[in-house]
Amino acid sequence: MKISIIGPGIMPIPPTGWGAVETLIWDMRNALTTLGHEVDIVNVNYPRKIIQKVNEFRPDFVHIHYDDWVGLYNYIQYPCACTSHFGYLEREEMFNGYVNIANAFAQIKPRVFCLSEGIKKVYQVLMDIPESNLYVSPNGVDCGSFNCVDTPDYPNASIYLAKIDYRKRQHLFQSIPSLWYAGNIADERFDKTKNYLGEWSKKHLYKNLTHYGNLVLLSDGEAHPLVCMEAFAAGLGVVVTEWGKANLDTNKKFITVIPEKHIGDI
């Protein structure tokens, strides 16, 4: 089977550092190739070039991994589906400019691979996409890439591994002495003199994530965060907000969910 995967066209695939969507696309490509499929990654930032590359490859199936490209759906002459990684999909009040993309989904009504049941409901209720076009397909992770040890170097320390930005709101938790941060900084409120480990390369991530006790992710919006799957692959517990609990078995002792109303108490 020939499969085209359309990426954002913003960063290289595979990424060298941060880039969850790019990592997912690369892992998906590798998994499908191992299964014997032929995969072409289209990762350019020009709509006409995207269509041209898809047509040149003549795939059996096309998977769009970037919301901004949903407008191309009707111009793709092969079976196609979209996946949105927008962190605020379940928080309509946080859409802001995304409302234009949501309206495009509502008008086109494409096939969608939803990252969770909650996101599927958003497409059904808010965008009036028929259930027959919606499929729940959570993110996966390449477990074989991660080092996993029984005795971590820093068992009493937790790591907040994510792009440091407004949605992740790392700056709110810098008073916690046992919480360390890794990621590129895109939020001027974050003090890089406090427990900042820099931006990790993929190689460093795969080797060293296992040496922390827990992963912390306290965003005010998430879809299905890949970093939680990476934490499990490396043997960590996770601490998330209610926005980051999609597809998690919250009855497990190594999963802690903090309600949004208690974020200020941390």
Please give the residue ranges for each predicted region.
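Short alpha-helical segment that forms part of, or immediately flanks, the ligand-binding pocket
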Residues: 206, 229-233, 247-248
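Aromatic "clamp/platform" in nucleotide-sugar-dependent glycosyltransferases that forms part
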Residues: 220
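Short hydrophobic beta-strand element within catalytic cores of glycosyltransferases
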Residues: 237-241, 247
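Acidic anion/phosphate-binding donor-loop and adjacent secondary structure
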Residues: 92-94, 124-125, 133, 138-156
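Conserved donor-binding/catalytic core segment of Leloir-type glycosyltransferases
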Residues: 113, 150-180
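Conserved acidic donor-binding segment of nucleotide-sugar-dependent glycosyltransferases
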Residues: 199, 252-264
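Active-site proximal beta-strand in glycosyltransferases
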Residues: 3-4, 61-64, 73-92, 113
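A short, active-site helix/loop in glycosyltransferases that binds the activated sugar's phosphate group
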Residues: 91-95, 100-133
